[in-house]
């Protein structure tokens, strides 16, 4: 996956362009001396140092941009690295199969699990097929169908959240978007199996929460979780999307802020420069956290899980 640099990464992009140019010349001209190779090494060291410096002080808006990065790994990317024997299950058994929600049975270290998550799509045709990761009611009903199946067979549920929000189209509203989300919130609160939810990119509003009522809620370091997008908030409060950076800061959408407010349990570190820089390393960190969470939840009986989940939900809105 090639690196796409965001605006605030431009100084890094400039150095990487020089490295690419020198490397290209070096591969063509085999007579290049040691000084030439040393210059490439110096630039690589400088790029790493500059990346560390920039990423040590990211604003909430810059983190929002990283959460939306076009090369950021999506749920199905992680499935390849973390799970085996993935068997996708389709349809809500009522209306249609919403491709914005992907789910099915899989194994993590030979243990059966039900995995469910948003899928945005990468190329234009796939983005349209996946509706840019914005589920309609049938997507949430499919997710609930799979959760109830997992509950019936005592299989833990792992959800992966990455959506701008639930689809706000007329058809979705006519088919009961708000009802589907509300039903998921209610039903997830009473499932008798462990639920681990991880925000891997954007966690947008009710569209995220509809598969995010977990016993453990994690966030990748450069993911976001909010009731509305920074642009939406800025449009309402300041009547201008130009104020999105200010809105992002005010809403506290980043993992560190949400951990401080006790709305999430863990922050999963990302490779230097973001998850897209090294998907394998990111997947290994995510897998480690999932296994840790499952082992902790395994120690609880059914009633303890339900009580813990209920108490967690009731604390929302309190510092």
UniProtKB/Swiss-Prot annotation:
Cellular component, GO, one term: acetyl-CoA carboxylase complex
Domain of life: Bacteria
Primary location recorded for the protein, binned into one broad class: cytoplasm
Record's keyword terms, sorted: ATP-binding, Cytoplasm, Fatty acid biosynthesis, Fatty acid metabolism, Lipid biosynthesis, Lipid metabolism, Nucleotide-binding, Transferase
Disulfide bond annotation, renumbered to this chain: none
Compartment annotation: Cytoplasm
Record's catalysed reaction(s): N(6)-carboxybiotinyl-L-lysyl-[protein] + acetyl-CoA = N(6)-biotinyl-L-lysyl-[protein] + malonyl-CoA
One biological process term in Gene Ontology: malonyl-CoA biosynthetic process
Cross-referenced Pfam families: ACCA
Pathway: Lipid metabolism; malonyl-CoA biosynthesis; malonyl-CoA from acetyl-CoA: step 1/1
Domain CoA carboxyltransferase C-terminal: 43-296
Enzyme class: transferase
EC id: 2.1.3.15
GO molecular function, one term: acetyl-CoA carboxylase activity
Family annotation (SUPFAM superfamilies): ClpP/crotonase (SSF52096)
InterPro entries: Acetyl_CoA_COase_a_su, ClpP/crotonase-like_dom_sf, COA_CT_C
Family: Belongs to the AccA family.
Subunit structure: Acetyl-CoA carboxylase is a heterohexamer composed of biotin carboxyl carrier protein (AccB), biotin carboxylase (AccC) and two subunits each of ACCase subunit alpha (AccA) and ACCase subunit beta (AccD).
Function: Component of the acetyl coenzyme A carboxylase (ACC) complex. First, biotin carboxylase catalyzes the carboxylation of biotin on its carrier protein (BCCP) and then the CO(2) group is transferred by the carboxyltransferase to acetyl-CoA to form malonyl-CoA.
Name of the protein in question: Acetyl-coenzyme A carboxylase carboxyl transferase subunit alpha
UniProt organism field: Baumannia cicadellinicola subsp. Homalodisca coagulata
């Amino acid at each position: 996956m090639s690196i796409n640099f965001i605006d605030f990464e431009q100084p890094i992009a400039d150095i990487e362009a020089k490295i690419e140019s020198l490397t290209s010349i070096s591969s063509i001209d085999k007579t290049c001396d040691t000084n030439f190779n040393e210059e490439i090494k110096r630039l690589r060291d400088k790029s790493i140092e500059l990346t560390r410096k920039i990423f040590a002080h990211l604003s909430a808006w810059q983190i929002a941009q990283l959460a939306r990065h076009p090369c950021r790994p999506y749920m199905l990317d992680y499935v390849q690295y973390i799970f085996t024997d993935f068997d996708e299950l389709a349809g809500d058994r009522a209306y249609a199969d919403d491709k914005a929600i992907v789910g099915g049975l899989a194994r993590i270290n030979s243990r059966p699990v039900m995995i469910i998550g948003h899928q945005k799509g990468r190329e234009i045709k796939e983005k349209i097929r996946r509706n840019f990761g914005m589920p309609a009611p049938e997507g949430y009903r499919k997710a609930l169908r799979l959760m109830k199946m997992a509950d019936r067979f005592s299989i833990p549920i792992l959800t992966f959240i990455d959506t701008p929000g639930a689809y706000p189209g007329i058809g979705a509203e006519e088919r009961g978007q708000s009802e589907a989300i509300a039903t998921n919130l209610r039903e997830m609160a009473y499932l008798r199996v462990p639920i681990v939810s991880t925000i891997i990119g954007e966690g947008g509003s009710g569209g995220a929460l509809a598969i995010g009522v977990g016993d453990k809620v994690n966030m990748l370091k450069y993911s976001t979780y909010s009731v509305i997008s920074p642009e939406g908030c800025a449009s309402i409060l300041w009547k201008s999307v130009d104020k999105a950076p200010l809105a992002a800061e005010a809403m506290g959408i980043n993992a560190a802020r949400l951990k401080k407010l006790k709305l999430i349990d863990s922050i999963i570190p990302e490779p230097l420069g973001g998850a897209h820089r090294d998907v394998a390393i990111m997947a290994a960190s995510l897998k480690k956290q999932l296994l840790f969470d499952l082992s902790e939840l395994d120690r609880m009986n059914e009633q303890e899980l339900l009580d813990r989940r209920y108490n967690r939900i009731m604390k929302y809105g309190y510092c």
